[in-house]
UniProtKB/Swiss-Prot annotation:
It is an enzyme of class 3 (hydrolase). This is D-aminoacyl-tRNA deacylase. It catalyses: glycyl-tRNA(Ala) + H2O = tRNA(Ala) + glycine + H(+); a D-aminoacyl-tRNA + H2O = a tRNA + a D-alpha-amino acid + H(+). GO terms for cellular component: cytoplasm. It holds the Pfam family Tyr_Deacylase. Belongs to the DTD family. It comes from Shigella dysenteriae serotype 1 (strain Sd197). The lineage of its organism: Bacteria, Pseudomonadati, Pseudomonadota, Gammaproteobacteria, Enterobacterales. Its EC number is 3.1.1.96.
Length: 145
């Protein structure tokens, strides 16, 4: 399971002209689900995402996680993160989970974020989405479990 996390000052997701999720300061989480992923990996990745210390403390040092910084989380499904790009000119998605399995684990990940008392917003699974963000820093990390 893969999360591309970006520290943002604001972010939103629009589907068919409707805003489905919007946050101020916090994390935009692009989530990719691979074939061998399960709830245990989703738990571990959620723990890492919410605990990752990439927000500045009073001294300007990256020392706070999103909860400590009072931020929110916007989770967006992104199957392209599971692409194999090692060869050729076209990505292969053979490493990605089936749509049903990916959606179940995406929903599970979102629920785990909510259970941690995070203000959690979402996109819409498998939809054609427009994601807008202001990357703060820029600060972007690739987390994989």
């Amino acid at each position: 399971m893969i999360a591309l996390i970006q520290r943002v000052t604001r972010a939103s997701v629009t589907v068919e002209g409707e805003v489905t999720g919007e946050i101020g300061a916090g994390l935009l989480v692009l989530l990719g689900v691979e074939k061998d992923d399960d709830e245990q990996k989703a738990n571990r990745l959620c723990e890492r995402v919410l605990g990752y210390r990439i927000f500045s403390d009073a001294e300007g040092k990256m020392n706070l996680n999103v909860q400590q910084a009072g931020g929110s989380v916007l989770v967006v499904s992104q199957f392209t993160l599971a692409a194999d790009t090692e060869r050729g000119m076209r990505p292969s998605f053979s490493k990605g989970a089936s749509p049903d399995r990916a959606e179940a684990l995406y929903d599970y990940f979102v629920e785990r974020c909510c259970q941690q008392e995070m203000n959690t917003q979402t996109g819409r699974f498998a939809a054609d989405m427009q994601v807008s963000l202001v990357n703060d820093g820029p600060v972007t990390f690739w987390l994989q479990v």
